[in-house]
Amino acid sequence: METPGLVVHGEAAPFSTALRSLVNNPLYSDVRFVVGQERQEVFAHRCLLACRCNFFQRLLSSEPGPGVPSPVVLSTVPAEAFLAVLEFLYTNSAKLQRHSVLEVLTAAVEYGLEELRELCLEFVVKALDVELVCEALQVAVTFGLGQLQERCVAFIEAHSQETLRTRGFLELSAPALLPLLRSDKLCVDEAELVLAARSWARVGAAVLERPVAEVAAPVVRELRLALLAPAELSALEEQNRREPLIPVEQIVEAWKCHALRRGDAARGTPCRRRRGTLPREHHRFLDLPFK
């Protein structure tokens, strides 16, 4: 009886190095990509991409016609991120950079590269800081990356004031902002949070060319106006007349809490203090303290 064969393994490093030398190398390349807004030309090898990634297998399944084939245009992925994806497909490793890792993560999700996605997520979690966290939160919400969203929200809860001052906060979508405004653990006072929400809505209104109140509508119900002192609420009401942001009925509800000297236990959240809520004299009348 013939003895079963034995699988032996050579050194992996030289193999990986050799394949890395083919990344974006026109030598023996049979497919060209034009990627990103910069329209950078990138060379690759059809069989390798197809066997490593179902997305590229489908994309490249048609046989190229005679003559010089037209390039495959991928305009939404930046060139640097696409090259990192290619490096991973060729070598099963990639060099990630803080400034571009979210773009690589986005590409990994869109191309169905689960292993690269997990590597990017691990990198992002370790690299989280005030400047990166809102961009990471936006990616997490957009692609339903629940664990990353939880880590981002927890980071922002611990560094609320610094995060609210970043450009990334102003560029959040409404669905990404909602979990922050719903949090009891934000280390920021409600008056400052109202100002941040107004700044966010102004930026969105300018970009989308829509009224501030319309942009703010999906999120402002999460502002806890009953936590503001009467003088603060009066000032907010006056500003709201000049620049509508908050529905009038929401301000009326806050005044009702002051008039009745109690919170609305049925609705709960509008009267519940956050971790960073500064004490005010009327808070002793509210039913729901910070938990």
Curated annotation (Swiss-Prot):
Residues 134-234 form the BACK domain. Transmembrane segments: none annotated. Pfam families: BACK, BTB. It comes from the Eukaryota. CDD domains: BACK_BTBD19, BTB_POZ_BTBD19. Residues 29-98 form the BTB domain. InterPro entries: BACK (IPR011705), BTB/POZ_dom (IPR000210), BTBD19 (IPR042846), SKP1/BTB/POZ_sf (IPR011333). This is BTB/POZ domain-containing protein 19.
